[in-house]
């Protein structure tokens, strides 16, 4: 038996950062190397995401349990993978996808497949004595991502009256990731004081950002501009802004409801264009509903030459959806969430498709996270140039930032911060 053969697979139900169950898998190889992976879960999910298998038993966790997914790993996936070479990642992922047999991993569950997929990769890296970013990315894995830091939460991520889901700061002007992280932390601290002085709540949402009640989306942007200046930075030059509109969340019957009124798609496009002129906004995610291809084209035509337009619900890390977007010129960037597609192999293929077509990739967390730091390594491995992993508090968010600090230290003089070369390829 060769040393990198899979000798054991175990799985268990654990809790994510919202106190909801999720799947953890452990893969052990013949050489003794072990890979451990935990799967995140989203709050605002795209309709076209791979299927997250939940138990539906109202007597446990309100039906959110994942014992079925755990059982599928133990009883179906494990027998098919024992003895397989962990270094043959694509073969292992294809085995699980074939075993599932459905179009969206509804049989075994994307959460079951992804947990084993990631644990296998980590075990393979451990067996070779390599950090995960080097194992996945090879010798060119040296680009540290610009963080898009979600410091004001709204929409489905917070219990407040703010329509847009995320208001982010982007410290692209820093000279290193370590400096970018410090800048973000200092703005976050300044924002806390600004909110406090205005008598606004400083409680945080799912992703660690503040979640105050505000009269408009524009009011949130004004707060960020004030905080950036208060922290001693130049808005637009050193630190810019980014939005996750999550427009599907407030779309109904062809209308978008925000700022207290219903608006047409054309009105929303004009609104986003105006905001991007009035504020130093470098990125807008999910500016329109996930299946409104026609208006996505219009938005891209109108401001895509100067603003990064990111498809999250639009593309759901799916190469088929991304290919359609490329052909129809909808958006110019894709958000990458491992659990939207459900395997490491398919995630890497989607990133490759984006890169070949000059679409930027932003590696992303989910609102329900764990202490797993895979996405930090993935961002460096793929040279994506950007990462979304929340605010500057809550340890499930900070864990990813701290992992990137360690990677930057490991790389030493080889490390390049993506902000110095324009936030990655595209």
UniProtKB/Swiss-Prot annotation:
Residues the record lists as binding Mg(2+): 244, 285, 312
Superkingdom to which the source organism belongs: Bacteria
GO biological process entries: glycolytic process
Pathway(s) annotated for this protein in UniProt: Carbohydrate degradation; glycolysis; pyruvate from D-glyceraldehyde 3-phosphate: step 4/5
PROSITE patterns, sorted: ENOLASE
Main location as per UniProt: cytoplasm
Record note on cofactor: Binds a second Mg(2+) ion via substrate during catalysis.
Keywords, comma-separated and alphabetical: Cytoplasm, Glycolysis, Lyase, Magnesium, Metal-binding, Secreted
Enzyme class, broadest EC rank: lyase
The keyword Ribosomal protein appears for this protein: no
SUPFAM superfamilies cross-referenced by the UniProt entry: Enolase C-terminal domain-like, Enolase N-terminal domain-like
Positions in coiled-coil regions: none
The keyword Nucleotidyltransferase is annotated on this UniProt entry: no
Catalytic-site annotation from UniProt: 207, 337
Name under which the protein is recorded: Enolase
């Amino acid at each position: 038996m060769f040393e990198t053969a899979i000798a054991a697979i175990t799985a268990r139900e654990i809790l994510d950062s919202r106190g909801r169950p999720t799947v953890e898998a452990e893969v052990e190889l013949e050489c003794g190397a072990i890979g451990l992976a935990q799967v995140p879960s989203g709050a605002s999910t795209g309709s076209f995401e791979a299927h997250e298998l939940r138990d539906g038993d109202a007597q446990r966790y309100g039906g959110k349990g994942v014992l079925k997914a755990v059982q599928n790993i133990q009883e179906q996936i494990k027998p098919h993978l024992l003895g397989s070479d962990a270094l043959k990642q694509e073969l292992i992922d294809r085995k699980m996808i074939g075993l599932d047999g459905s179009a969206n991993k509804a049989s075994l569950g994307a959460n079951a497949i992804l947990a084993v997929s990631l644990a296998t990769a980590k075990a393979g890296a451990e067996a070779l004595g390599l950090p995960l970013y080097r194992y996945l990315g090879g010798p060119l894995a040296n680009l540290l991502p610009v963080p898009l830091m979600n410091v004001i939460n709204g929409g489905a991520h917070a219990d407040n009256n703010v329509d847009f889901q995320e208001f982010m700061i982007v410290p692209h002007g820093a000279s290193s990731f370590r400096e970018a992280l410090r800048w973000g932390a200092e703005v976050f601290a300044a924002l806390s004081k600004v909110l406090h002085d205005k008598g606004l709540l400083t409680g945080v949402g799912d992703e660690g950002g503040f979640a105050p009640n505000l009269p408009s989306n524009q009011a949130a942007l004004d707060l960020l501009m004030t905080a950036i200046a208060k922290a001693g930075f130049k808005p637009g030059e050193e630190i810019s802004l980014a939005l996750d509109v999550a427009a599907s969340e407030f779309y109904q019957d062809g209308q978008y409801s925000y700022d207290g009124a219903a608006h047409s798609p054309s009105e929303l496009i004009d609104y986003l264009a105006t905001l991007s002129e009035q504020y130093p906004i470098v990125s807008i995610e999910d500016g329109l509903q996930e299946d409104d291809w026609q208006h996505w084209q219009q938005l891209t035509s109108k401001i895509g030459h100067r603003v990064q337009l990111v498809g999250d619900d639009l593309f759901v890390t799916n190469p088929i959806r991304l290919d359609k977007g490329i052909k129809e010129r909808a958006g110019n960037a894709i958000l990458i969430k491992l659990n939207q597609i459900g395997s490491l192999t398919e995630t890497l293929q989607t990133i490759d498709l984006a890169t070949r077509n000059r679409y930027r990739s932003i590696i992303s967390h989910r609102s329900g996270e764990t202490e797993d730091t895979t996405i930090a390594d993935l961002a460096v491995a793929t040279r994506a140039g950007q990462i979304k992993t929340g605010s500057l508090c809550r340890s499930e968010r900070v864990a990813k930032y701290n992992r990137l600090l360690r990677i930057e230290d490991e790389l030493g003089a080889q490390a390049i911060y993506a902000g110095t070369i324009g936030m990655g390829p595209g």
